[in-house]
């Protein structure tokens, strides 16, 4: 499979991108927006197989993480920076018609892009384990925190009250929460792209989102497109896991509000069904893409 890597100038920095395969016939490329902010493209390499269907798959590290520039620039860590980076990437690579998949923060980015920028040439959106509003997300994570052992709940409350997240007790509580709803530990049997060391965009995450998944406090804390998503015209596939941070309530809220949408719930997954149920996810995704080219 042909893999092309390169860098695009963005602001005074550079953005790394990776293109797998080429489009054949009438197929349109699939562009992937990673989560975080700051999570890197790495985990998306488990979707390289989508290119075997005769479709280019394009992933990139958003500014502030991975193989892209990682300046200490808290002033840049907001939705506008990353959406304009996507717009620039489409121009740079001549991506007139695409399918756009955003996971977690990447899905928020896709939603804001769709609602505020109303871009042309989007054949479909795939909203993967994402959210229409930070307030709904916080409410659902708080509900789930209440299922942790009491001492873990207490450690979280103490850390939040003091604004100090360095205690061992807090870190163990957060790790348990993420183990339940985000992802399992990476081990020797995990795909290489998950085991590979990466430059996580910690500053980008903390500045834009916050200290953890249940306390949005950064530049995205007021993210809310609950009303606007009702006007998305393009076909939308919503994907989520049963134990996902994107709970069935969050996913169904999007499904109910977005007119031309379908929802696929992955029964054995947390926040990354494309990793945990890889074969099924690729099957669902290929079927969707072929239907909407």
Swiss-Prot record:
| Entry annotated with the keyword Transcription | no
Keywords, in A-Z order: Aminopeptidase, Hydrolase, Protease
Catalytic residues? 104 (nucleophile), 244, 271 (proton donor)
For this protein, the record's Pfam families field holds:
Abhydrolase_1
A GO MF term: aminopeptidase activity
Provide the reaction this enzyme catalyses.
Answer: Release of N-terminal proline from a peptide
Q: Domain named AB hydrolase-1: which ranges?
A: 28-277
Q: Name one GO biological process term.
A: proteolysis
InterPro entries assigned to the protein according to its UniProt record, in alphabetical order:
AB_hydrolase_1, AB_hydrolase_fold, AB_hydrolase_sf, Peptidase_S33, Pro_imino_pep
Q: Please tell me whether the keyword Protease is annotated for this protein.
A: yes
The superkingdom listed in its UniProt entry is Bacteria
Q: What is its EC number?
A: 3.4.11.5
- What protein family is recorded? Belongs to the peptidase S33 family.
Which NCBIfam families does the annotation name?
A: pro_imino_pep_2, ProImpepLactob
**Role this protein plays:** Releases the N-terminal proline from various substrates.
- The name of this protein is Proline iminopeptidase
The species this protein was found in: Clostridium botulinum (strain Hall / ATCC 3502 / NCTC 13319 / Type A)
The organism's taxonomy opens as: Bacteria, Bacillati, Bacillota, Clostridia, Eubacteriales
């Amino acid at each position: 499979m042909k893999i092309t890597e390169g860098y695009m100038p963005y602001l005074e920095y550079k953005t790394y991108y990776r293109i797998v395969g080429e489009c054949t016939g009438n197929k349109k490329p699939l562009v992937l927006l990673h989560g975080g902010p700051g999570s890197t493209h790495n985990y998306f390499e488990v979707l390289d197989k989508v290119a075997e269907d005769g479709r280019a798959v394009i992933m990139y590290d958003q500014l502030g993480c991975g193989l892209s520039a990682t300046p200490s620039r808290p002033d840049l860590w907001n939705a506008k920076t990353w959406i304009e980076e996507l717009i620039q990437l489409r121009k740079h690579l001549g991506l007139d018609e695409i399918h756009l998949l955003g996971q977690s923060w990447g899905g928020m980015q896709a939603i804001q892009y769709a609602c505020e920028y109303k871009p042309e040439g989007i054949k479909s959106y795939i909203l993967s384990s994402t959210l229409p509003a930070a307030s709904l997300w916080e409410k659902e994570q708080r509900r789930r925190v209440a299922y942790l052992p009491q001492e873990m709940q207490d450690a979280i409350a103490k850390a939040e009250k003091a604004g100090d997240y360095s205690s061992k007790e807090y870190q163990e509580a957060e790790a348990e929460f993420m183990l339940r709803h985000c992802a399992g530990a990476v081990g020797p049997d995990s795909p290489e792209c998950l085991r590979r060391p990466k430059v996580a965009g910690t500053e980008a995450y903390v500045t834009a989102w916050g200290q953890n998944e249940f306390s949005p406090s950064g530049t995205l804390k007021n993210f809310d497109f609950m009303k606007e998503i009702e006007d998305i015209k393009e076909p939308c596939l919503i994907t989520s896991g049963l134990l996902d941070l994107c709970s069935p309530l969050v996913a169904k809220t999007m499904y109910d509000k977005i007119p031309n949408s379908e929802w696929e719930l992955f029964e054995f997954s947390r926040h990354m069904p494309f990793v945990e149920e890889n074969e099924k996810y690729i099957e669902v995704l290929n079927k969707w893409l072929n239907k909407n080219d």
